């Protein structure tokens, strides 16, 4: 019986950290890899790459824990989130806080193996991860904070590799914010009706009938910024082809969200994993020496 209870608790932690739903970690991973490849340039040192890949998964898990902790009194009123571990009682508030601390401590121990500049930047990463879940109560732009939180690995990656944060770094950071606002607005469109009822704020609510248009403008901005990064770093044809393919994926997403149907909007959100992957493959191809 004790083993059964322990197993159930571990499964609840697994769900709380969203390790069964890797999309969030992947959307955090791709910009991290973009930054590592541009900063190096090419293939980064194995240990630095390992630290960042592990850090992505750990901090995304920590972010999910604090997000559910912040939303624990709201999630029970939303159909999609009512059965999450905290509102369902599978995990207590004390356990969630302890799990968050453990995940952050492991992440920080990994960062301590890197240089001082990266360690200092990691403090801001923790602050962003903690603040984001609470922003949806106070502003209709929590997605901007999410973009900053998901993109903070970019200056950290540049700092870890070169101990500098050049113009390309900040252009990539801005591109990631625009991308995150676009894809998380698609995600928020799924819950828009429920969010209005319970008082949660989002860009999907703020943009209203102009949501599709603004998402499209943001996506164009992402492509333009990534093209500028390519020019600044002398990237090859493979990279620019990846931007074209990413643009085609954005067009596909626009078709999916055309009628604002929940399942289609969620499918559009999920499709952004391929955008990140394609852009990374383009970068890798540019630095590949045949």
Swiss-Prot record:
Its main location: membrane. GO terms for cellular component: plasma membrane. Its cofactor is Mg(2+). Disulfide bonds: none annotated. It catalyses: all-trans-octaprenyl diphosphate + 4-hydroxybenzoate = 4-hydroxy-3-(all-trans-octaprenyl)benzoate + diphosphate. InterPro entries: HB_polyprenyltransferase-like, Prenyltransferase, UbiA_prenyltransferase, UbiA_prenylTrfase_CS, UbiA_sf. The chain crosses the membrane at residues 23-43, 46-66, 99-119, 141-161, 163-183, 213-233, 234-254, 268-288. Belongs to the UbiA prenyltransferase family. Catalyzes the prenylation of para-hydroxybenzoate (PHB) with an all-trans polyprenyl group. Mediates the second step in the final reaction sequence of ubiquinone-8 (UQ-8) biosynthesis, which is the condensation of the polyisoprenoid side chain with PHB, generating the first membrane-bound Q intermediate 3-octaprenyl-4-hydroxybenzoate. This is 4-hydroxybenzoate octaprenyltransferase. The gene is ubiA.
